[in-house]
């Protein structure tokens, strides 16, 4: 709850790194608290990353594992003046937030919340997000670190801790020093419901269609003017209405999603995000988009257009399939915590995906964070306690199997 009160929102419009200096306010506190635990090498680097090591206490040669969470919170809702509230022994009904009583966390709209009857639920007060994404993960790693440092009877290998900035703007591991991190395998603590274990995520590309029209004075434009704006609108309108969009897909279905249109009569840009669990399907989606573009363009004499595709990230399953023990050990740790593992796929990206392709195979483990990026955000304290237990058991599992 202390961490939640520190404003650490990242800024998607910033070109600095980290995108906001205030993220370091929490990072500096984490370094101080890690050092107070006896983790003497805890440090904050110039880019806003926290690195720390829990030393091994076993003679076995155990792979070095890393636990990672991000300190920044989303810019989708205010993160200033967060006032966390504990709703003790939640009664299973709606939660009305006191600072804005129009903000109600409905048990009907949030069935997972309804299943947490009897738990202690943390929310914000109604005017901000909570920031459990991912301060729940940060707190869980810190609690587990404190436990391991004070319980030498729990045997484990060297454990690396990594706290990152700017995950919410897609730049979370952009400047991670992998040599300094020096870990063999990793786990992001950034998942949702109790027991969830995510070892697969979307593969992602970005695409930009640039339409070039012909400008003319509106008063004498007949048979001359060709509007790039209108052509761009036709391209977007030609996308399927009942498929291939975020609002019409779920489970393992991919999509083509226009996220920005900007321009003039002479030149208009349309930005798309293209997603699918199968990397090979991205090319098919991009070919489909090109056909739409060409078909629309053929109706407008003199107009031109280009399509540029940029790789964004890939499905971490492509890496993790070669290291099955990483996910298997996590599932075993979750079971030891008394929870049934729920294997899930992420309809989005994760720092773990990028880390996996940077040489650190890295699935995602639950934290309890729910209703992310909103004033309705909540987390169960009991779920968080189970996440802490999972981290501790996971350290033990790796040592036992070494």
Question: How does the language model describe each region?
Answer:
Residues 1-21, 123, 215, 313, ...:
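N-terminal capping segment at the start of a domain
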Residues 15-62, 66-68, 72, 83:
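A non-catalytic alpha/beta surface segment that caps or lines the substrate-entry region
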Residues 21, 128-139, 222-230, 378-385:
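Short, conserved micro-motifs enriched in small and acidic residues
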Residues 60-158, 163, 183:
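Active-site metal-coordination/substrate-binding segment of hydrolases
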Residues 64-68, 184-188, 208, 362-364:
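Short glycine-aspartate micro-motif
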Residues 95, 110, 119-132, 165-287, ...:
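Midchain, well-structured core segments that form catalytic/ion-binding scaffolds
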Residues 229-402:
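Metal-dependent amide/peptide-bond hydrolase catalytic core
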């Amino acid at each position: 709850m202390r961490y939640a009160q520190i404003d650490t929102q990242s800024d998607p419009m910033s070109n600095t790194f980290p995108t906001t200096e205030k993220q370091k306010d929490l990072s500096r506190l984490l370094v101080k608290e890690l050092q107070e635990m006896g983790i003497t090498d805890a440090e904050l680097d110039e880019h806003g990353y926290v690195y720390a090591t829990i030393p091994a206490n076993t003679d076995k040669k155990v792979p070095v594992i890393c636990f990672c969470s991000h300190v920044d919170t989303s810019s989708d809702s205010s993160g200033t003046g967060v006032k966390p509230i504990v709703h003790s022994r939640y009664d299973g009904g709606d939660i009305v937030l006191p600072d804005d009583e129009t903000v109600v966390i409905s048990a009907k709209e949030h069935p997972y919340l309804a299943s947490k009857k009897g738990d202690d639920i943390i929310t914000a007060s109604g005017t901000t997000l909570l920031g459990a994404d991912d301060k729940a993960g940060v707190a869980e790693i810190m609690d587990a670190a404190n436990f391991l440092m004070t319980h030498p009877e729990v045997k484990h290998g060297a454990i690396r801790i990594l706290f990152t900035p700017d995950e919410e703007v897609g730049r979370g591991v952009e400047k991670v020093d992998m040599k300094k991190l020096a870990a063999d395998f990793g786990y992001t603590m950034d998942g949702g419901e109790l027991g969830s274990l995510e070892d697969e995520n979307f593969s992602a590309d970005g695409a930009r269609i640039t339409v070039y029209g012909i400008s003319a004075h509106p008063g004498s434009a007949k048979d001359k003017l060709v509007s790039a704006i209108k052509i761009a609108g036709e391209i977007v309108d030609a996308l399927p209405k009942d498929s291939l969009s975020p609002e019409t897909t779920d489970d393992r279905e991919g999509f083509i999603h226009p996220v920005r249109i900007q321009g003039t009569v002479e030149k208009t840009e349309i930005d798309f995000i293209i997603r699918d669990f199968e990397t090979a399907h991205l090319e098919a989606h991009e070919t489909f988009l090109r056909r739409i573009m060409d078909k629309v363009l053929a109706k407008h004499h003199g107009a031109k257009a280009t399509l540029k595709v940029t790789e964004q990230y890939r499905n971490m399953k492509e890496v993790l399939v070669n290291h099955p023990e990483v996910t298997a050990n996590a599932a075993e740790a979750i079971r030891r915590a008394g929870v049934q593992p729920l294997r899930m796929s992420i309809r989005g990206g994760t720092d773990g995906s990028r880390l996996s392709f940077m040489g650190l195979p890295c699935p995602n483990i639950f934290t309890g964070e729910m209703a992310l990026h909103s004033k309705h955000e909540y987390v169960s304290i009991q779920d968080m306690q189970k996440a802490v237990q999972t981290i501790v058991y996971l350290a033990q599992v790796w040592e036992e199997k070494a």
